[in-house]
């Protein structure tokens, strides 16, 4: 069954909110859950990347002017970089977990940094898909989404 962009975003946003919460609490009892969620995020972000390149970016490039092509290519590059950064950090994380306990001081800032980049990417994709919306319209949409899935996911 084919998924939509909103369905991907609706899956990714709560995952990030949960990651933020886990990193904030730093509960040693959640280490196994953190490992699972990090692995889950690799799969979801990789699937999202394939989807968004095929179903969103490719159609946006079809017949686009030079300005639009440049903007979409920036989005594509950032999407690829997100996936690669996640894979690299997960490999590093898994390697460390085999020899040492979870280092929250190392993991928490990486989670915040990565989730911030994903949120920014999602906002840029949404803005590219709805360029006629004003800043106020986008702010209202973010406020609505915040009410729906939590402040960290907006």
Residue map of PLM features:
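Small-residue-biased structural context
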Residues: 1-154
